[in-house]
């Protein structure tokens, strides 16, 4: 996925007392539920217009997401940051988005930010901003990213240096899989070099650019723009076959990774960076079908 720019419009905030109350007691629903009344302009990528949505809520941990327009060549390809409130109350951030005032208010209301993760080579734009805002948090990069961005982004840990790519300090709450099976043509280096994460307590899968779930026509009462429809068609019909058949050069290794993520791991909610949150067997089928086209 090419780098793009997050462009949220200025949110309208609810009274602070209501924001704090609702942030402490997020509601659970079959679909994402807003944490508070703060809002952005409604777009297909954020049809509720909310700053943060509740995705999963369990007794001892929860998952939230912040969806924003993600504009590439005037096309909104959608962007979503995942937030996990871990069992100890600390926060794990997946693929950080721009940390504007409204987003920071919501994040800070949930708990202390302890871990921030850039899951692949592309989703790095706001990593430095988050590290500066939360200097005590550990900033993780996918394998090779720390060296790749040396002097630009201050990554603390390269997940390639961590056995199994899952740090001990995550207290066994995650399963991690590094898709180290691709090569960029003519260059010979990895393309995404993505790590996929499963938060076990909430049965939630976080995936970045390996799988997308773009809606065909509308979502949440908001029509999908023509440009986004064209983007979806190009990604589905042109890019994905090229990626799976040409760029994935280690077929056996790729199949092993797909086997773990799509079949072995016991997740039920899919939180993609690009597209809609999906649940249940439909979500698992999307991942299987997407990654088994080769």
Residue ranges and their predicted role:
Residues 68-70, 96-98, 121, 144-145, ...:
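Active-site metal-binding loops of divalent metal-dependent hydrolases
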């Amino acid at each position: 996925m090419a780098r793009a720019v997050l462009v949220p419009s200025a949110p309208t905030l609810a009274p602070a007392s209501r924001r704090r109350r609702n942030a402490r007691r997020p509601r659970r629903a079959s679909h994402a539920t807003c944490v508070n009344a703060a809002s952005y302009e409604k777009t297909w990528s954020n049809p509720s217009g909310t700053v943060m949505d509740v995705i999963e809520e369990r007794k001892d941990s929860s998952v939230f997401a912040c969806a924003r327009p993600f504009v590439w060549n005037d096309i909104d390809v959608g962007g979503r940051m995942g937030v996990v409130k871990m069992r100890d109350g600390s926060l794990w951030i997946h693929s950080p988005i721009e940390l504007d005032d409204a987003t920071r208010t919501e994040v800070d209301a949930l708990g202390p930010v302890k871990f921030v993760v850039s899951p692949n080579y592309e989703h790095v734009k706001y990593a430095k901003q988050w590290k500066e805002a939360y200097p005590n948090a550990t900033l993780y990069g996918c394998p090779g990213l720390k060296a790749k961005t040396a002097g630009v982004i201050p990554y603390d840990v390269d997940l390639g240096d961590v056995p199994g790519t899952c740090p001990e300090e995550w207290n066994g709450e995650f399963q991690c899989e590094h898709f180290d099976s691709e090569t960029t043509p003519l260059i010979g280096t990895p393309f995404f070099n993505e790590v996929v994460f499963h938060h076990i307590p909430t049965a939630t899968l976080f995936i970045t650019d390996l799988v997308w779930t773009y809606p065909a026509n509308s979502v949440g009462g908001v029509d999908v723009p023509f440009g986004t429809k064209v983007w979806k068609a190009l990604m589905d019909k042109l890019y994905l076959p090229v990626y799976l058949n040409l760029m994935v050069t280690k077929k056996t290794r790729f199949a092993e990774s797909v086997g773990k993520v799509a079949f072995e791991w016991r997740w039920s909610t899919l939180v993609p960076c690009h597209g809609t949150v999906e649940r249940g067997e439909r979500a698992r089928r999307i991942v299987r079908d997407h990654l088994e086209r080769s």
